[in-house]
């Protein structure tokens, strides 16, 4: 127990030494960064770093809070601030800050602010962070802890010497000890020790006030406003942290936040040379400056300085001309490099008092400092697009020539609208500003200009049309045969009829369907994507319509049907059947919209009287007259139908019958004509038996000598029952029409 208590006391002593020596390194006037002379220099040697029992009497009384830690009470964070003391300045002094590009920014007048905070150190014993709580509980080694603290102190001393405040102090000492030359370029151009660097110790648990001083969080250079760096700090600040040392009571941490810019200058405004230079700069001002603290300057001060400037104007001008001739080339090259593109327009820094800016740089600044007007199209040019509030045309405006813009930029602004006159009544819009922001001509703009070129330039469009017509004339293969939907193409129908008449009996119905599909005009094939209905997509046949197809009844197996019904040869019977089907379709316009080849097919078994009437007709005209009549009727009937359905598709069957009489569901979307031999086809074939009986009765009444042939027909139908199940539509048609 005694050993543990001794170890705990040693650890507490090391914690007290940590707070005291860290504060001493930052605040002591004998630290290495203040070694301007050899007197009263306190050596931070190895003995001082290793001796943790020494108490420093130079520290203020506030440090006593952190000098006697017992391990039970909570230690607040200790804050040490390093600041630039301005209390010795009077109202005639002006404090300015130079940024990294050499531009001067006005900070304040001598009596406006008392301090400018440069650094803020945070020294704390952290016993609540997750890092400390997650640390393993090992036995504390006092010797190891002492070595770690010595390493921390040495690192802290090195860090202090590298901070910007040390450089400011060294230059301040040089300006004190050096010759007081008003024309010199020293950062501190004061006649005495008017400013100094000081430190103060604060309690981190209490709020830190910035009244009467420029706090660390306030950016002097306004280009840093609303900007953060990688460490989530304001852009004008930087931060350094030292690796913490672990103890059983908490982590010993040290961190610092400091200003990046430290090159301050102090000028006396009552100085004659400064007044002359300040007046010359004010005459050649390049925009608003960051001078918020100079608003209290009265007109009397200006009136006092102005006569002085007029009395010494001539000798000062001679001196200025000599300086300008010597430095003109150097100033031009330097300032052209120092002008940043990202520089703030409304908060530009003040120009250095002992330098003159060339006229070329001044001329460049005028268009830059001009405030941007978002409601003007011509942001690149000097004029707006139009001053007329009405919807005036852009072509009435004089063209604004821009060397980097495309010459067709004016017409391009109206591309998205319907017409040129449909633009907004305002002189511009945000869309036009967006297009004006691009200086280079892109590929899209070139394509759009080509597209707009033809309606805007009729001569070139006519030339393009002439070239296109010549191209068509030179290549006759490119001629387009265009036919309207209402007027079907003039196709030689007689050739098709002759082809059907000369078909050999050995050909089956599939070859006929293929011949129909091959004879289709490709110009009248419809695309399925053009249909807007939700019904099953039928197979579309050509817009012109042929007569009744030569079905199996015209072939060798069923040739007796034509003889029995027509009473003549097979060719004349086929012509009569086609003629009858055409007459029937012309009289029944109220039927379903099927072509003449299906004329009355779905309702053929409801018209037995008409069948007998047509069966009693004979061949009364010559073949030529019949062909002419057939062609005329087909030409007239073809115009009444726009499309037909393939004779073998399920859609043709379902569309021809009344839906209430069909005992099966409607077929779904079939992409091609199909023949499905399912049970429903047998039901559809039942009317064929009645048709055969009707045909036998008509033959027995009119043609008794052909009775045996009718029996043969029935025998043939029974033999070909399987085929009739598939191709029953053709049998029904011809048995009805014969």
From Swiss-Prot:
InterPro entries: ATG13, Atg13_N, HORMA_dom_sf. It comes from Saccharomyces cerevisiae (strain ATCC 204508 / S288c) (Baker's yeast). Phosphorylated; hyperphosphorylated by the TORC1 kinase complex to repress the induction of autophagy in nutrient-replete conditions. Starvation and TOR inactivation results in ATG13 partial dephosphorylation leading to ATG1-binding. Rephosphorylated by ATG1 during prolonged nitrogen starvation. Also phosphorylated by PKA. PKA phosphorylation regulates the association of ATG13 with the PAS. Within this regulatory network, mitochondrial respiratory deficiency suppresses autophagic flux. Hyperphosphorylation in rich medium is impaired in the absence of VAC8. Transmembrane segments: none annotated. Present with 149 molecules/cell in log phase SD medium. Changing residue 348 to A: Leads to constitutive activation of autophagy. It comes from the Eukaryota. One of its GO terms (cellular component) is autophagosome. Residues 345-359, 534-558, 570-579 have a biased composition (Polar residues). Keywords: Autophagy, Cytoplasm, Phosphoprotein, Protein transport, Transport. Activates the ATG1 kinase in a nutritional condition dependent manner through the TOR pathway, leading to autophagy. Required for autophosphorylation of ATG1 at 'Thr-226' and its dimerization. May also be involved in the regulation of autophagy through SNF1. Involved in ATG9 and ATG23 cycling through the pre-autophagosomal structure. Also involved in cytoplasm to vacuole transport (Cvt) and more specifically in Cvt vesicle formation. Seems to play a role in the switching machinery regulating the conversion between the Cvt pathway and autophagy. This is Autophagy-related protein 13. The extended 70 Angstroms-longloop of ATG13 specifically binds the highly conserved innergroove formed by the armadillo repeats of VAC8. One of its GO terms (molecular function) is protein kinase regulator activity. Changing residue 469 to A: Impairs binding to ATG1. Residues 279-359, 377-462, 521-599, 690-719 are annotated as: Disordered. It is found in: Cytoplasm; Preautophagosomal structure. Residues 284-297, 306-338, 382-399, 417-429, 694-708 have a biased composition (Low complexity).
């Amino acid at each position: 127990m005694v050993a543990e208590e001794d170890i705990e006391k040693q650890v507490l002593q090391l914690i007290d030494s940590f707070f005291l020596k860290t504060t001493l390194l930052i605040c002591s006037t004998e630290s290495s960064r203040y070694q301007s002379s050899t007197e009263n220099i306190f050596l931070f040697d190895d003995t001082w770093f290793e001796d943790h029992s020494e108490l420093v009497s130079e520290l203020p009384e506030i440090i006593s809070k952190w000098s006697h830690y017992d391990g039970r009470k909570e230690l607040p964070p200790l804050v040490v601030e390093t600041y630039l003391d301005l209390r010795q300045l009077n109202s005639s002094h002006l404090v300015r800050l130079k940024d990294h590009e050499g531009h001067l920014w006005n900070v304040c007048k001598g009596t406006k602010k008392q301090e400018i905070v440069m650094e803020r150190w945070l020294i704390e014993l952290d016993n609540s962070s997750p890092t400390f709580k997650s640390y393993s509980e090992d036995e504390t080694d006092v010797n190891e802890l002492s070595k770690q603290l010595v390493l921390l102190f040495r690192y802290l001393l090195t860090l202090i010497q590298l901070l910007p405040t040390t450089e400011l102090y060294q230059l301040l000492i040089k300006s004190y000890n050096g010759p007081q030359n008003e024309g010199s370029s020293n950062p501190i151009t004061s006649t005495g020790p008017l400013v100094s660097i000081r430190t103060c110790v604060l309690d981190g648990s209490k709020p830190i006030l910035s009244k009467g001083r420029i706090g660390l969080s306030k950016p002097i250079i306004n280009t840093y406003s609303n900007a953060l760096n990688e460490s989530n700090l304001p852009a004008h600040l930087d931060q350094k942290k030292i690796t913490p040392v672990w103890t059983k009571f908490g982590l010993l941490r040290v961190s610092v936040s400091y200003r990046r810019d430290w090159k301050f200058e102090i000028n006396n405004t009552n100085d004659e040379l400064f007044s002359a230079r300040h007046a010359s700069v004010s005459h050649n001002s390049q925009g608003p400056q960051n001078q918020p603290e100079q608003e209290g300057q009265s007109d009397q001060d200006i009136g006092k300085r102005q006569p002085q400037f007029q009395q010494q104007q001539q000798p000062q001008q001679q001196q200025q001309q000599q300086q300008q001739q010597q430095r003109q080339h150097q100033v031009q090259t330097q300032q052209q490099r120092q002008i940043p593109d990202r520089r703030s327009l409304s908060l530009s820094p003040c120009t250095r008092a002992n330098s003159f800016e060339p006229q070329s740089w001044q001329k460049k600044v005028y268009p830059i400092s001009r405030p941007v007007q978002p409601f003007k199209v011509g942001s690149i040019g000097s004029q707006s697009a139009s001053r007329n509030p009405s919807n005036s045309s852009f072509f009435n405006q004089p063209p604004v020539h821009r060397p980097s813009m495309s010459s067709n930029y004016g017409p391009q602004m109206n591309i998205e609208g319907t017409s040129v006159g449909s633009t907004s009544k305002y002189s511009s819009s945000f869309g036009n500003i967006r297009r004006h922001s691009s200086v280079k001509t892109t590929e899209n703009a070139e394509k759009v200009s080509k597209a707009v070129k033809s309606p805007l330039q009729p001569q070139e469009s006519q030339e393009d049309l002439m070239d296109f017509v010549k191209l068509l004339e030179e290549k006759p293969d490119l001629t387009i045969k265009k036919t309207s939907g209402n007027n079907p193409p003039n196709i030689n129908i007689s050739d098709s009829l002759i082809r059907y008449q000369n078909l050999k009996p050995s050909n089956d119905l599939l070859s006929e369907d293929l011949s129909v599909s091959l004879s289709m005009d490709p110009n009248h094939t419809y695309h399925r994507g053009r249909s807007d209905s939700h019904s099953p997509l039928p197979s579309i046949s050509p817009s012109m319509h042929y007569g009744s197809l030569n079905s199996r009844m015209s072939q060798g197996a069923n040739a007796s049907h034509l003889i029995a019904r027509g009473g003549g040869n097979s060719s004349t019977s086929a012509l009569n059947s086609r003629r009858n089907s055409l007459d029937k379709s012309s009289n029944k316009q109220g039927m379903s919209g099927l072509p003449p080849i299906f004329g009355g097919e779905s309702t053929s078994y409801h018209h037995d009287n008409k069948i007998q009437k047509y069966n009693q007709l004979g061949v009364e005209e010559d073949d030529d007259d019949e062909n002419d009549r057939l062609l005329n009727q087909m030409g007239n009937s073809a115009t009444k139908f726009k499309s037909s359905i393939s004779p073998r598709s399920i859609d043709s069957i379902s569309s021809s019958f009344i839906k209430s009489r069909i005992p099966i569901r409607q077929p779904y979307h079939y992409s091609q004509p199909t023949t499905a031999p399912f049970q429903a086809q047998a039901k559809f074939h039942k009317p064929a038996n009645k048709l055969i009986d009707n045909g036998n009765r008509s033959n027995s009444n009119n043609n008794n000598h052909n009775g045996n042939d009718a029996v043969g027909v029935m025998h043939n139908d029974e033999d070909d029952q399987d085929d009739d199940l598939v191709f029953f539509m053709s049998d029904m048609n011809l048995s009805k029409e014969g």
